[in-house]
């Protein structure tokens, strides 16, 4: 059950080195390394392309059409955090724009992940403040109803607990549980190393058919070549 009207000020953040290190590996590699779990729904898209970030989650539960708690959340941000926001019911209003981004950026936030709408996207890009959202909308919000900050939330279908690691890029958004951050970093680095070896073989002209030993199972499945 959601707690409303609360702010947890002391949260256990994931290991900082692990949280920082996952950015370079990207969402797809991290998702695979975790066993293909942790992925937010694919409608969560960056408002502009080219950013690849990771950081520890400060979570926000919002009410439809009301961004009051985003201002409350700003106070809880520490350098290296990513704000993750969910809404109690579906809403695409523009909860976040350049003024809140200025506040978040001053506190050290690396990004915002919000299962709702944002606006001022041109200015946000000029500010180099990345956002992943499900909508872009000029429609503003009010400030009247309490939500909560730093409670477990479900954002775009994924449970996010305060302090978890968020990895986001052009391919999507992944949540890594804080307790698994170090383990997942090691697994993702190992996977990246293997992919580097495969990439070199493919670049040399080796076919995936041979590298992955696909020919025999394809033949057994009934594939026929016709000249």
Swiss-Prot record:
Cysteines engaged in disulfide bonds, as pairs: none
Binding positions for Mg(2+) per the UniProt entry: 120
Residue numbers binding substrate: 97-100, 119
The keyword Nucleus is assigned to this record: no
Pfam families according to UniProt: RraA-like
InterPro entries listed in its UniProt record: LigK_PcmE (IPR014165), RraA/RraA-like (IPR005493), RraA/RraA-like_sf (IPR036704)
Temperature dependence: Retains 50% of maximum activity after incubation at 54 degrees Celsius for 10 minutes.
Stated pH dependence: Optimum pH varies depending on the substrate used and phosphate concentration. In the absence of inorganic phosphate pH optima are 6.6 for L-4-carboxy-4-hydroxy-2-oxoadipate, 8.0 for D-4-carboxy-4-hydroxy-2-oxoadipate, 6.7 and 8.0 for DL-4-carboxy-4-hydroxy-2-oxoadipate, 8.3 for DL-4-hydroxy-4-methyl-2-oxoglutarate, 9.3 for DL-4-hydroxy-2-oxoglutarate and 8.8 for oxaloacetate.
Enzyme class at the top of the EC tree: lyase
Keyword check for Magnesium: yes
Keywords: Lyase, Magnesium, Metal-binding
Induction description: By growth on aromatic carboxylates such as phthalate, terephthalate, m-hydroxybenzoate and p-hydroxybenzoate.
Details of cofactor binding: Divalent metal cations. Probably Mg(2+).
Subunit structure of this chain's protein: Homohexamer.
Function: Catalyzes the last step of the bacterial protocatechuate 4,5-cleavage pathway. Has a broad substrate specificity and catalyzes the aldol cleavage of 4-hydroxy-4-methyl-2-oxoglutarate, 4-hydroxy-2-oxoglutarate and 4-carboxy-4-hydroxy-2-oxoadipate, and the decarboxylation of oxaloacetate. Preferentially cleaves the L-isomer of 4-carboxy-4-hydroxy-2-oxoadipate, and has lower activity towards 4-hydroxy-4-methyl-2-oxoglutarate and 4-Hydroxy-2-oxoglutarate. Does not cleave 4-hydroxy-2-oxovalerate, citrate, 4-hydroxy-2-oxobutyrate, 2-oxoglutarate or fructose-1,6-bisphosphate.
Family the UniProt entry places it in: Belongs to the LigK/PcmE family.
Protein name (Swiss-Prot/TrEMBL): 4-hydroxy-4-methyl-2-oxoglutarate aldolase/4-carboxy-4-hydroxy-2-oxoadipate aldolase
